[in-house]
């Protein structure tokens, strides 16, 4: 049964009437551009065909009533006329409440809503299940109450909810691609200006995501350390962010920098350049050049930014050996585990999957999870 049918049926059973709208917002994978977002740089994500779906309808009062199908149909009810606080037990409720809290500050004409939520974005895999939920909830209120908000506003609202209400620090990429993605396209996002450009993806290219299932444990503390090192690098060059540092200037003064900071700066500067080139290369279907750029990105994350782990490097090598020049592969996400992303002709998917099944578990002791995705549309009615 589809998510759409499931949420609609549970809505009718639980609330005693049929939903008027069903909304979806997708998860995402970042094809290239890692740890560039908080340095005001460039990223190249695409939305994927895993999403959060919400069956919904207006209420005549000021209550927001929500059922989370994936959490044993837990319910949450709160009022728009009272201060919106965190839920004492249910973390999923905080994402809903946070989105609604900041929507109220952006648009006065909100009213009550009934919602039933379900999703199939894998949680904990770095595919942005939380951003998908935030954008879906924002889109519900925007649709039902015709709020004068853009898709970018919905994305920024979701980021604010996650940062300030839930308390998880995140950049803007995840919400922007979930809100603004286009079918069969990636999106080049300038994280400083929030300007976007759709990058058409050749129809015969598959987006393959493979979860290493390596348990990440350093990601929080190491993320903060990398961020501080990047800020130190920007200060050294007298800039507010590494976005404004030129590679030539870095090359001239690299020897003056702390060696570790220099490695971090080199990654960000070269990754920005790779991301801009990758957008052009992808649009013209040059998989051979894309493979080189993705390989350089992974090597930079491994050697200069030092955020990969042996299981990730092993999986990348297995896929790379199987693909040759017929596609690219790299780690994606914050690092220290998580997923790798590969772009390849659809006819190569089966042989890559077979190679991974043959070698990865035998060499790492871990069993991968394999997702074959399509670049999908951002949030909207379904």
UniProtKB/Swiss-Prot annotation:
GO terms for biological process: galactose metabolic process. The keyword Hydrolase does not apply. GO terms for cellular component: cytosol. The active site is at residue 174. It catalyses: alpha-D-galactose + ATP = alpha-D-galactose 1-phosphate + ADP + H(+). Pathway: Carbohydrate metabolism; galactose metabolism. Substrate binds at residues 34-37, 223. Its EC number is 2.7.1.6. Catalyzes the transfer of the gamma-phosphate of ATP to D-galactose to form alpha-D-galactose-1-phosphate (Gal-1-P). Belongs to the GHMP kinase family. GalK subfamily. This is Galactokinase. It comes from Erwinia tasmaniensis (strain DSM 17950 / CFBP 7177 / CIP 109463 / NCPPB 4357 / Et1/99).
């Amino acid at each position: 049964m589809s998510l759409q049918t499931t949420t609609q049926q549970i809505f009718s059973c639980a609330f005693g009437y049929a939903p008027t709208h069903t909304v979806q917002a997708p998860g995402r994978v970042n094809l290239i551009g890692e740890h560039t977002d908080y340095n005001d740089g460039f990223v190249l994500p695409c939305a994927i065909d895993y999403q959060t779906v919400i069956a919904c309808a207006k209420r005549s009062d000021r209550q927001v009533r929500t059922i989370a199908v994936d959490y044993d149909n837990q319910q949450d009810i709160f009022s728009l006329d009272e201060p919106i606080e965190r839920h004492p037990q249910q973390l999923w409720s905080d994402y809903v409440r946070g989105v609604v809290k900041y929507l109220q500050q952006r648009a006065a004409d909100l009213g009550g809503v009934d919602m039933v939520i379900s999703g199939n974005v894998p949680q904990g895999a770095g595919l942005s299940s939380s951003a998908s939920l935030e954008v879906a909830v924002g889109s519900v209120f925007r649709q039902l109450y015709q709020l004068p908000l853009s898709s970018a506003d919905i994305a920024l609202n979701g980021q604010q909810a996650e940062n300030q209400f839930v308390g998880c620090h995140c950049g803007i990429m995840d919400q922007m691609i979930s809100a603004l993605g286009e079918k069969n396209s990636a999106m080049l996002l300038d994280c400083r200006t929030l300007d976007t450009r759709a990058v058409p993806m050749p129809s015969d290219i598959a987006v393959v995501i493979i979860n290493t299932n390596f348990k990440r444990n350093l990601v929080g503390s190491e993320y903060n350390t990398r961020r501080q090192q990047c800020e130190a690098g920007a200060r050294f060059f007298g800039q507010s962010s590494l976005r404004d540092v030129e590679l030539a200037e870095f090359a001239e003064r690299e020897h003056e920098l702390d060696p570790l900071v220099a490695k971090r700066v080199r990654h960000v500067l070269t990754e920005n350049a790779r991301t801009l080139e990758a957008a052009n290369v992808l649009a013209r279907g040059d998989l051979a050049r894309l493979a080189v750029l993705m390989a350089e990105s992974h090597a930079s994350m491994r050697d200069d930014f030092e955020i990969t782990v042996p299981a990730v490097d092993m999986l990348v090598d297995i896929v790379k050996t199987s693909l040759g020049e017929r596609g690219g592969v790299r780690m994606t996400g914050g690092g220290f585990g998580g997923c790798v992303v590969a772009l390849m002709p659809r006819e190569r998917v089966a042989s890559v999957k077979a190679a991974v099944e043959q070698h990865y578990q035998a060499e790492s002791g871990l069993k991968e999870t394999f997702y074959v995705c399509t670049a999908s549309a951002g949030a909207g009615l379904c």
